[in-house]
Amino acid sequence: MVQLCLLRHGESLWNKENRFTGWVDVPLTDFGREQAEKAGESIKKEGLQFQVAYTSVLNRAIETLEIVMKTIQQNIPMIKDSALNERMYGDLQGLNKEDTAKKYGNQQVHIWRRSYDIKPPNGESLEDTQKRTIPFFMNCIMTDLKEGKNVLVVAHGNSLRSIVMYLDKLSKEQVLSLELPTSLPIIYNLAPDGKVIAKKELRL
């Protein structure tokens, strides 16, 4: 059995300001750094040992991973790839979510944020995001898992939603209600062939 840990980065400045972030490279807040440290403590308490870590090329994910690695005292290879970047929100990037909902309506904004195949203006849908995350997941992360390595992945709400959708075999309708909190470690136990045996969340 091998283990895969998926972790969304800690609170970023634009999470705090309730803005659409996407590919804009904003930093963590102090609270986000605390969240990352607590996530690391949860992982350490669970006794998880990793052989490799993956993250995006955006600093909020990289810093979260660095804090977690320091907290769990594991110096492991870190692989950064834009395939794990957050979904690109197009014209919505930088806009306040509440103001956007007032302009376009709550239902429209919810569809842009949570549906599978509907894009925000000039942005990516979750389906588009999955077209880059899943090939990378299968070619790199799953390859490591099948080689017997435990893998830590620190990324973003929608890049991770696309991976959870794949692993949990969720439908387009089911993924609408999938929410991934910041800095909550999700642990998958997988068989040598990559099939999911069990899943749990590490809540402090």
Regions found by a protein language model. Give the residues of each.
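Short, well-ordered beta-to-alpha junction loops that form the rim of enzyme active sites
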Residues: 55-58, 83, 114, 149-150, ...
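Glycine-rich phosphate-binding loop signature in dinucleotide/nucleotide-binding domains
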Residues: 46-49, 143-149
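GST superfamily/GST-like fold recognition
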Residues: 157-162, 197
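Short, solvent-exposed aromatic-acidic interface loops
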Residues: 200-204
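Extended, charge-rich low-complexity interaction segments
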Residues: 107-123
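Residue-level preference for the first positions of well-ordered beta-strands
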Residues: 4, 148-154, 185
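Phosphate-coordination/substrate-recognition cap region in phosphate-metabolizing enzymes
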Residues: 38-110, 165-181, 186-189, 196
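Loop-to-helix element that buttresses phosphate recognition and phosphoryl-transfer chemistry
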Residues: 5, 11-63, 103, 120-135, ...
